[in-house]
Curated annotation (Swiss-Prot):
Domain of life: Bacteria
Gene Ontology biological process terms from the UniProt entry: L-proline biosynthetic process
Pathways per UniProt: Amino-acid biosynthesis; L-proline biosynthesis; L-glutamate 5-semialdehyde from L-glutamate: step 1/2
Source organism: Listeria monocytogenes serotype 4a (strain HCC23)
Keyword Amino-acid biosynthesis attributed: yes
Record: residues binding ATP: K14, S177, D178, T219, G220, G221, M222, L223, T224, K225
Major localization listed first in the record, in broad terms: cytoplasm
Name assigned to this protein: Glutamate 5-kinase
Binding of substrate, residues: S54, D141, N157
Amino acid sequence: MRESLKNSKRLVIKVGTSTLMYGNGHINLRTIEKLAMVLSDLRNEGKEVILVSSGAIGVGCHKLQLPVRPTSIPDLQAVASVGQSELMHIYSKFFGEYGQVVGQVLLTRDVTDFPISRENVMNTLDSLLSRGIIPIVNENDTVAVEELEHVTKYGDNDLLSAIVAKLVQADLLIMLSDIDGFYGSNPTTDPDAVMFSEINQITPEIEALAGGRGSKFGTGGMLTKLSAASYCMESNQKMILTNGKNPTVIFNIMQGEQVGTLFASKKEELSHDRTH
């Protein structure tokens, strides 16, 4: 299964706030610069790359010198507005250093749920990729709401990245997080925690092993990553969860090395076997 990853042509890379930001709330420019280098090199190699990036609120908090993440929706959305602009400025600068053009794509759940607008998103992403542009996707946190009558929020970018991977029929979703993979117990408190190399089915037992929220500047936790993995597997797609502290790990993944946790259903493996 890992060996087949070498043939992946269309990739979705998801990077979380914990990878983009230091724990003290400052922007991790070194990691972002490395990420831009890796994705640019993949483009040079002939791969198609889509980046799903969190961080608008975290970067906004830094830009506005806020010590903690706001709690009210208007404040969060105002901070996201500032942060998204700053985040794209940083990405444009770093990707530009490697000769790449990036394009911003901000989505809300109603857009990808409604057939006509969903098709429009698919066409837009295809057009960007065909022009050699790297789409940078984020939820439109400035306008997204979560109400009973009108839900437009995805809840987190883990699910958004899985939805994008399905929309563009990506060969692989690589989720960069602050953990090396999916463990049987919490590796921060259990030194003997064992990491799963591959998971073929999200069982109640697997779900029970996940718990807790993400960083103070982000929203995701292991449960949201499992939900994204489940979405991918139901769509007959593959996802790898790994640590994003050194984005060059993506090169190792693309060489078929045993990095992180691979989520892939058995039926995906069977369909792959039939085509080879």
